[in-house]
Structures are given as C-alpha cells and as structure tokens.
Amino acid sequence: MHPDLLPVIVGVGQINDRPENPLDGRDPVTLMADALRAAEADAGTALLADADWIGVVQQIAFPEIADASAPVAAALGAAHAELVQSKGPNGDSPILLLNEAANKIGAGEIKIALVTGAEALRTAGARKAAASGGQKGDALRDATHRVKVGYAQSHGLVVPTDVYPLYENALRASLGQTLAEGQAESGEIWSRFSEVA
C-alpha cells in the first residue's frame, strides 16, 4: 500500500444525551450528526462536508427512521458522499463499517470516510410512554429484526443481556469455577473496563 493511502483516524466524537426530561432527548440522526461534529472538532479541521463515504450503524430506537444515512449526510452538508448503513444493529457493526472505510481508503477509492452510530432508547421509550398513556415500550425487544420466531426467541433469548449470561456460565463451568468465583472474575474485568472508560 502506498503511504499516501494509509487509513488514519483523525478525529473521534461521542455524545451522551441524558436531559433531565427524557422527552427532550435527541433522535438518533441528530445524535449521529452531533457525534460527527464532535469528531470534526477533535480533528481540528473541516472534513464533514467533503466526506466521500458515510457509514451509519442501523439504529432501532426510532423504527420510522429506516435508514439514517441520508438524513445524517444532509445534516452535515455531505451531498456527494456514498451512503452505507450496516445490515442490522449488531455489536460488530461499527467495526465492520470502519474496516470497509479503511479498505476503500487503502484502495484509493475514497479519501474521507465518516463512521457513526447512535441509539436513543431512553428518549424513544419516554416518547412512546407519553403517546400511549404511560406504557413504556422496550425498543430492543420490539425491534423488527428481533421479533422473529426462531429457536432462540422461543426460549426468551431476544437481546444481548439474555444471551451473554449463557456465554459467561459456559466459560465459568469450563474453567471449573463456582458461581461466586465466576462473578468475582467478571467483576474484576468489568471494573477495569470502567476505569478506562
């Protein structure tokens, strides 16, 4: 690869949207655009409007936004960018988009790529509750890509928090740990992640 084509991350941005009243929260498109603006500020140079490629992680909080890539591009003034949305809001979606962007840069197909994603589950739940007289929905469990009838779903395994404990218990059992030992080890690992975060 020619050194001029080496993909480099020049800016990163993150938005935590927790207004006192959840109804005042931002939607996923606004969160994505704001995160990219924060990344542009981190980069210290104007890049967004010149983006050649925008990769967006599919969001589920607002099902009426089927594909957030075009509204994000419009919010940034990136009229000529190739738009891509991940195939599902999976845990590996951001890294798959980052890999795709890096490969396109390395191949000389594009120069500026933007990767973004956002969820507004708290806001979506509050708005649904306000519209339905107090019944708060569960956007994760109600998402159309999860409401499929299959083996896992028939046993109540719908969202990551249903499945991850199975992995942890299988690992614990294979290591010959008691429940208390397994929980202590998980606690140590996650506390270190929290320190870094």
Please report, for each region that a protein language model flagged, where it lies by residue.
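Elongated alpha-helical scaffolds
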Residues: 93-96, 108-114
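Conserved "HGTGT" condensation-loop signature of ketosynthase/thiolase-family condensing enzymes
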Residues: 1-88, 102-107, 114-197
